Amino acid sequence: MIVSVLFIIFVGLGGGITVGAGFVAFLTVMGIIPRLMQLTKTMRFVQAYEAAVILGAVCGGWETLHMNHLYLTKWIAVPVGLLAGLFVGMLAAALTEVLNVLPILAKRIGLRSKIIILLMAIVIGKIAGSLFHWLYFIDHS
C-alpha cells in the first residue's frame, strides 16, 4: 500500500515537473511573451508578465488537483471571461506571428496579395465557432 502511494506521488510529481518545464520552455524558446509585450507595447511590465505566468501555472495546477468551484455572478464572470479570451487571442496572435504562419500559408495557397481576407476568414470562423459552442452546446447540455 505504501509503495503504491509513493509510486503515485513520484509519477505525479514527475509528470507535473515535465509539463511545467515544457510549458516554460515553450514560452521561452518560442519568444511568445516578449513578442506579446512588443505587440502590446508593454515592455515595462516584464515582472508582471512573469508573475502572471507563474501564478497562472500554480493556480491552474492547484485548481486541477482540488477542483474548487468559483460561484461568480454573471456580472463578474462575463468580464473575467472576456479578459481571458482577450489574453488567449493575443497569445495566439503572438504565436502565429512568431512562427510566421500566415505569410507562409498565404504563399502556399496562392493568396499572397489577399492576406487580409485570409486573416478575416480566420477571425470570423473563430467567432462563429465560439458563438456556436456557447449558444448551442452550453444551453443543450
Curated annotation (Swiss-Prot):
Q: Do the record's keywords include RNA-binding?
A: no
Top-level taxon in the UniProt lineage? Bacteria
Annotated TM spans: 7-27, 45-65, 75-95, 115-135
Task: Print the keywords alphabetically.
Answer: Cell membrane, Membrane, Sporulation, Transmembrane, Transmembrane helix
Subcellular localization is given as: Cell membrane
Tell me any Pfam family this protein matches. Answer: SpoVAB
Q: How does it sit in the membrane?
A: Multi-pass membrane protein
Q: Does the keyword tRNA processing apply?
A: no
Q: Kindly list the biological process annotations in GO that this record carries.
A: sporulation resulting in formation of a cellular spore
Q: Which GO terms describe its cellular component?
A: plasma membrane
Query: What name does this protein carry?
Result: Stage V sporulation protein AB
